[in-house]
């Protein structure tokens, strides 16, 4: 399926010069959304993921249905200060700002094979931080799956040898 036709591009959002890739047009189309999740599930099975991790917030709308499709667990990687139990956190740079992510200390078991799922790979700051958190807990990141990749921002350079699947590239 050509998923690019389901992505709306919004100029100058959230600030001038940014061309925001809006996935809500994909999400609202049931057959396209389902097909996107199923395509990513093929990749997740290939890398033999034990669990899916998704960074807040749009990683939840990719990762949770992906884990459901596969019948495996989902680990939410939250914004700092949002988790009620003991957690670890790490700071990172966004395409247009700064933030911090956190995960519960018992969310991932040592040796667990983790696939990271998110809507977008841009500069790589979010994925690099998510990998860092998972590895701190002893997890093995076996892949990263995205609806969209902004290849001109070279986020792949922050991932190393981890296999990547992106449905749409800009």
UniProtKB/Swiss-Prot annotation:
CDD domains: PRTases_typeI. Keywords: Cytoplasm, Glycosyltransferase, Purine salvage, Transferase. Pathway: Purine metabolism; AMP biosynthesis via salvage pathway; AMP from adenine: step 1/1. Transmembrane segments: none annotated. GO terms for cellular component: cytoplasm. It is an enzyme of class 2 (transferase). InterPro entries: Ade_phspho_trans, PRibTrfase_dom, PRTase-like, UPRTase/APRTase. Its main location: cytoplasm. Its EC number is 2.4.2.7. It comes from the Bacteria. One of its GO terms (molecular function) is AMP binding. It catalyses: AMP + diphosphate = 5-phospho-alpha-D-ribose 1-diphosphate + adenine. It is found in: Cytoplasm. One of its GO terms (biological process) is AMP salvage. Homodimer. Catalyzes a salvage reaction resulting in the formation of AMP, that is energically less costly than de novo synthesis. HAMAP family: Aden_phosphoribosyltr. Belongs to the purine/pyrimidine phosphoribosyltransferase family. This is Adenine phosphoribosyltransferase. The gene is apt.
